[in-house]
Amino acid sequence: MTTTDPTAGQMIHCFNQSIGVREGTVLKGGASEPYYKPGSPDTIYFREDFIRSALHEVAHWCVAGSARRTLPDYGYWYAPDGRDDSQQTAFYAVEVKPQALEKAFCQAVGIEFNVSVDNLSVSLSDPAIALFEAAVEDRFGSLVLNGLPKRAEIFRHALIEYSRLYHWPSTFASDVGS
């Protein structure tokens, strides 16, 4: 049996045919920037054909409550690259939960996970990055112990099924919430 890496099209199909159809939400690639648009159906746009972008944007959707899912981009602010220290600290605070879920999704399909600081102005030696990585790992550990939120678990389960179908190198198939 050979393993292959997942494609953006497979991620889209997996989401749209599992949790997406149930929740009236579609996942679409090809966007120049990720964006969530409420409507009928709600649409999660991810960047170009980047699988990590797809998983990250689905993680944000899984974190957003029903009220936030009625707002464009869940009502979040976004400061572009070049954030100052206080903006970067705020970014870290809101990114812990979605990036912990993203790690679970990445492991379900055998994709390497690294935190994203989403700011080219941040020095890789900045101690805040290590603190952020630790916070994401702590949250991920909590998910391993306590299980994923319902929508995230449904999507993770679908990813695991696709991993089996397409022979992706899943490293997480039986560890979380099962």
Residue spans for each PLM region:
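Auxiliary, metal-adjacent structural segments of Zn-dependent hydrolase domains
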Residues: 1-39, 88-95
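Short pre-active-site segment immediately N-terminal to the catalytic Zn-binding motif
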Residues: 3, 38-53
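Helix-loop segments that flank and shape redox-cofactor active sites
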Residues: 35-42, 76-78
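Active-site recognition of the HExxH zinc-binding catalytic motif
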Residues: 52-65
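Post-HEXXH active-site segment of zinc metalloproteases
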Residues: 63-96, 114-123
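An active-site-proximal "capping" alpha-helix that borders the catalytic cofactor pocket
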Residues: 92-107
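Substrate-binding/catalytic groove segments of enzymes
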Residues: 105-117
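Pan-zinc metallopeptidase signature
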Residues: 117, 121-178
